[in-house]
Curated annotation (Swiss-Prot):
Biological processes, Gene Ontology terms: meiotic cell cycle
Residue ranges of domain DH in the record: 48-207
GO cellular component terms, A-Z: cell division site; cytoplasm; nucleus
Gene: mug10
Compartments, record wording: Cytoplasm; Nucleus
Organism encoding this protein: Schizosaccharomyces pombe (strain 972 / ATCC 24843) (Fission yeast)
Record's function text: Has a role in meiosis.
The protein, known as: Meiotically up-regulated gene 10 protein
Domain of life of the organism encoding this protein: Eukaryota
Keywords for this protein: Cytoplasm, Meiosis, Nucleus
Coiled-coil region: none
GO molecular function: guanyl-nucleotide exchange factor activity
């Protein structure tokens, strides 16, 4: 009975201890957070700079893992199969890409300087990524033979997306070295590497645009005798509204920066079929329409009237004004040279 009488007292005492213990634990849990915040405030330039370098290395490691995953899931299972030439090309390029980044990650670890490793690997980057870009058409060929084509496109485009990260990382490195010259890093090398990678990304983007333009024009023109092997940048691909008094059998167009115009019924690449392939000669802005004078493949002159204040019309006008400005600039320069020569 005595024991039973003392039980409530023991329970109350233990309950009080439990509450005090929980209070102590809660304060202990908040202490590390406070310490981390204080530490973050007191972070030195050297530790911040080293964290950026480590981030570059860890990003390269994750990228290498993604490449190996794609290699094992997509490339290797179809290697022994009969494939189109485009599919073989993209597979070969991807394997070379995987080797490049595996070696690059190892160099970053051994040298401890990811910026130096990137600067040394730049020539290989140019060759490998250029070849990979011009073989992108092989992705659609691979999608036809793999069991799960839904993930193929996204996984095989990862290299071009990852390439854009290098200038971002290098810009952060340059910013730190410019702000804190005492840091252990070669500022000139970092700036040059950043400029080279920016130039490479711009070049690859242009190559990708050329390749996409080539694929669209190839699908449209087929075997109609158009020299689609000439690099052309597509300026406009979209709906066209003919002027109200004129009716044509097309409702969209592909317009290239060299003046090639392909009239088509649909905008989507799969449904695109060329109605007429023409070369743009002149563009005039009339009161009720935009007049586009063209020459078709049979040598016949045509007048296309587009509705004003539309996307297609504005693109035609902009292209024509830019081209006219360039030609006028060349003529003025030649005239000035003639005047100078006459005076001398």
């Amino acid at each position: 009975m005595a024991l039973l009488k003392t039980m409530p007292i023991i329970r109350s005492l233990t309950r009080g201890k439990s509450i005090r213990l929980l209070q102590k634990q809660s304060t202990k849990r908040t202490n590390p957070c406070v310490y981390l915040e204080a530490k973050a405030v007191e972070q030195t330039p050297a530790t911040e700079f080293n964290s950026i370098l480590q981030e570059i290395i860890s990003t390269e490691y994750n990228y290498s893992v993604d490449l190996k995953k794609t290699l094992n899931e997509i490339i290797m299972p179809i290697e022994g199969q009969s494939m189109e030439r485009e599919a073989i090309g993209i597979c070969t390029c991807f394997k070379t890409l995987n080797q490049l980044h595996t070696k690059l990650y190892q160099q970053m670890i051994s040298s401890g300087s990811p910026v130096y490793s990137l600067s040394q690997s730049l020539p290989a980057f140019r060759d490998v990524y250029h070849m990979y870009t011009i073989n992108l058409s092989g992705i659609s060929a691979i999608e036809k033979i793999i069991s799960d084509p839904s993930s193929c496109n996204s996984q095989l485009l990862i290299p071009l997306q990852h390439l854009l990260r290098y200038p971002i990382h290098l810009a952060r490195v340059c910013k730190m070295l410019r702000k804190y010259p005492f840091l252990n890093g070669d500022f000139r090398m970092a700036v040059k590497t950043l400029d080279d990678f920016r130039e490479l990304c711009s070049y690859i983007d242009q190559e990708k645009a050329r390749e996409e333009s080539y694929q669209v024009l190839s699908a449209l023109c087929g075997n109609q005798g158009v020299a689609v092997d000439i690099p052309r940048h597509i300026k406009f691909k979209g709906s066209v509204i003919p002027a109200t008094s004129f009716i044509y059998d097309f409702n969209a167009c592909v317009f290239c920066d060299d003046g090639l115009v392909v009239w088509t019924r649909y905008v989507k690449k799969i449904e695109m079929k060329a109605v007429s392939i023409e070369q743009c000669l002149r563009v005039d802005e009339l009161s009720n329409s935009i007049l586009v004078c063209t020459l078709n493949m049979k040598g016949k002159l045509l007048n296309r009237h587009l509705a004003p204040q539309t996307m297609a019309a504005s693109v035609f006008l902009k292209w024509y004004h830019e081209r006219a400005g360039i030609s006028n600039g060349k003529e003025n320069k030649l005239n000035r040279l003639k005047v100078v020569n006459a005076k001398t």
